[in-house]
């Protein structure tokens, strides 16, 4: 593994700017680059199979308007996910790439239990990080599997921003990253016109034992700027370019 100045390159949807997103080609691309982490999204089929897909339907990737949750795996397996092959099942990806780590966005509540079952069956809890914009979804996951590693929930991200930038602690806020296995805060560099990732934010996150991962960063100058701020990870659609810009990747 080559060095990247301590900044991990995380392939967003498997590097959606360099391979068809969330496909076997994308997963293979991540592995061929020698990356440690792939970011992906999960949906569940009508018969409970966990599928790599950002969207709830297949219109954008397979020109099929049907929802993933409406289709059985048999029906899904007959479709082209964008690279001439069927959609990727999480269980198959975990088995086929035993050294690859997956940063998983739980796109719907229905997928939580099924995803946990798949990850447990593959004995892969140590190489999966769960994320979600839904605080409730993360809470359910943590209750069902206390050993699961997650990123910080949205409410706690706000609490961290206020604490870092203004020294404020929200009344009644539970600092969930001090309980359980929360290892990273994953945020955009800015929310609208408001900067999120600042030197104070990065420093506070590090004091709290959290890595800082920034999404979705595709411009070389922005990659360099964030790396200079000592962020720990850059989530990008162009991982090959990011490796070139940052000089490789540090093993994690």
Question: Residue spans of the language-model regions?
Answer:
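Phosphate-group recognition and catalysis centered on beta-loop-alpha active-site segments
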Residues: 1-252
């Amino acid at each position: 593994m080559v060095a990247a100045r301590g900044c991990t390159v995380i392939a967003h949807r498997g590097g959606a700017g360099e391979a068809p997103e969330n496909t076997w080609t994308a997963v293979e691309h991540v592995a061929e680059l020698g990356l440690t982490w792939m970011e992906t999204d999960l949906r569940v089929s009508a018969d409970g199979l966990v599928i790599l897909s950002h969207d709830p339907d297949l219109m954008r990737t397979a020109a099929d308007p049907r929802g993933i949750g409406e289709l059985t795996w048999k029906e899904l397996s007959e479709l082209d996910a964008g690279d001439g092959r069927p959609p990727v099942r999480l269980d198959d990806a975990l088995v086929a790439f035993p050294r690859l780590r997956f940063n998983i966005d739980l796109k719907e509540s229905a997928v939580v239990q099924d995803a946990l079952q798949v990850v447990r069956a593959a004995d892969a809890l140590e190489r999966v990080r769960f994320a979600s914009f839904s605080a409730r979804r993360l809470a359910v996951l943590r209750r069902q599997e206390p050993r699961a590693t997650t990123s910080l929930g949205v409410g706690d991200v706000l609490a961290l921003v206020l604490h870092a930038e203004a020294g404020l602690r929200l009344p009644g806020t539970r600092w969930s990253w001090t309980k359980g296995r929360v290892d990273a805060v994953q945020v955009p560099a800015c929310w609208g016109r408001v900067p999120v990732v600042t030197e104070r934010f990065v420093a506070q996150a590090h004091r709290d034992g959290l890595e800082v991962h920034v999404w979705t960063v595709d411009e070389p100058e922005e990659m360099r700027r964030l790396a200079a701020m000592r962020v720990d990870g850059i989530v990008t659609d162009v991982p090959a370019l990011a490796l070139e810009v940052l000089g490789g990747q540090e093993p994690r």
